[in-house]
């Protein structure tokens, strides 16, 4: 949802920053790698040790930094196919680290099985949501839309984790449950989004055509 309503505004707001970064000689791919590496480092060190607030702050900072690669690409006149693949791949790895770090905290620090289950569901479905779209597009079909995409997931999980961190520092009991609520909301919305994307593929033109034996569409192991 945020991807639809906020993309144009974000692109316009970050255009000057993109031009400034390009003038330094930094490349969009370098920004992608730096932002991803820093987000992963924060997720696997701060979240598992219970530093949810500071983990949220660091991850949010570098997620915003990582998003500047698009502004830089536009400032240079366009991106590359390699850059698009690198960005998408790094996003999946960063998401895995964020939800993996939270899952570790849920098990070994919070000792909450329900929170672990919700986080695990989100970890899996977040990858499936992105994969379904990529696989559909590779087959010439459409899997756009759905209730929740990556920007939505990041906002919900980071707000929840940040509020829980604040609740822990200040002893505000009800705030401590923020990440629990956030993860269950994400789990439900992510499952719905997976179903929406599969149905979108099913209703795409040509989706029900019978393929020949030599082009069965069976995915080969990678």
What are these regions (language model features)?
Residues 1-58, 63, 98-222:
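Hydrophobic alpha-helical transmembrane segments
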Residues 64-112:
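Hydrophobic, well-structured mid-protein blocks that either form specific transmembrane helices
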């Amino acid at each position: 949802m945020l991807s639809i309503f906020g993309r144009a505004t974000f692109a316009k707001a970050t255009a000057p920053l993109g031009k400034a970064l390009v003038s330094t000689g930094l490349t969009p791919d370098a920004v992608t790698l730096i932002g991803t590496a820093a987000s992963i480092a924060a997720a696997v060190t701060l979240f598992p040790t219970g530093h949810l607030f500071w983990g949220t702050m660091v991850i949010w900072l570098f997620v915003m930094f990582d998003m500047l690669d698009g502004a830089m690409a536009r400032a240079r006149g366009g991106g590359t196919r390699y850059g698009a693949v690198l960005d998408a791949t790094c996003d999946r790895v960063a998401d895995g680290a964020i939800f993996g770090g939270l899952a570790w905290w849920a098990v070994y620090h919070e000792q909450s099985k329900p929170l672990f289950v919700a986080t695990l569901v989100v970890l899996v479905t977040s990858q499936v949501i992105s994969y379904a779209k990529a696989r559909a597009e590779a087959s010439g079909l459409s899997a756009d839309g759905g209730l929740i995409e990556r920007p939505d997931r990041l906002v919900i999980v980071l707000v929840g984790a940040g509020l829980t961190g604040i609740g822990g520092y200040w002893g505000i009991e009800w705030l401590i449950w923020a990440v629990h609520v956030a993860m269950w909301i994400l789990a439900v919305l992510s499952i719905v989004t997976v179903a929406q994307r599969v149905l979108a593929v099913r209703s795409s033109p040509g989706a029900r055509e019978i393929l020949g034996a030599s082009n069965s569409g069976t995915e080969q192991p990678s």
